[in-house]
Regions:
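Conserved catalytic submotifs in the C-terminal HATPase_c
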Residues: 8, 13-23, 60
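Short beta-strand/loop element within the Bergerat-fold HATPase_c
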Residues: 50-61
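Short helix-loop "hinge" at the ATP-lid/N-box region of the Bergerat-fold HATPase_c
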Residues: 42-43
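Conserved glycine-rich
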Residues: 49, 115-116
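A residue-level detector for a conserved hydrophobic packing site
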Residues: 31-32
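Short conserved segment of the HATPase_c
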Residues: 74-88
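Acidic ATP/Mg2+-coordinating residue in the GHKL
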Residues: 69
């Protein structure tokens, strides 16, 4: 239940590609917050219609997951600041959409808590891409 996300209610489609089972010994609430906050961010700011979540790597020690949307992306110079607390790319649009500016910071700290790392980049064909890893044990 914690991981159930409904972007369809906001007019977006969720596409997943997990070709094998992933088991992580971690805090379910924090792992849920990673997916929830990334999804809420995509719904609020991407202006796209699709969210893609895929398993990139799954081995004995870690799994790597890619979370993407097909929106407009952000300027390259802002990518490094996306995980800062209270940072907003477009301050005017953020006020209209609500939120605290903490979502992506929460994502980063939840990933770090699980011994992983996270990066943000623009997709070549538009939108944002988040690649993150989670240690299994």
């Amino acid at each position: 239940d914690e991981l159930e996300i409904m972007p369809e209610d906001e007019g977006m489609s969720l596409h997943t590609d997990f070709n094998e089972e992933v088991v992580i010994d971690g805090n379910l609430s924090l792992i849920g917050s990673i997916f929830r906050n990334l999804t809420e961010n995509a719904i609020a700011y991407s202006e796209g219609k699709n969210i893609f979540i895929s398993l990139v790597k799954n081995n004995e020690t870690e799994c790597c997951i890619r979370f993407e949307d097909d929106g407009v992306g952000v300027e390259e110079k802002q990518l490094s600041r996306l995980f800062e607390r209270f940072y907003r790319v477009d301050k005017g649009r953020s006020r209209q959409k609500g939120g605290t500016g903490l979502g992506l910071s929460i994502v980063k700290h939840a990933v770090l808590f699980h011994g992983g790392s996270i990066t943000a980049s623009n997709r070549p064909d538009g939108g944002l891409r988040f690649d993150f890893s989670l240690r299994k044990h």
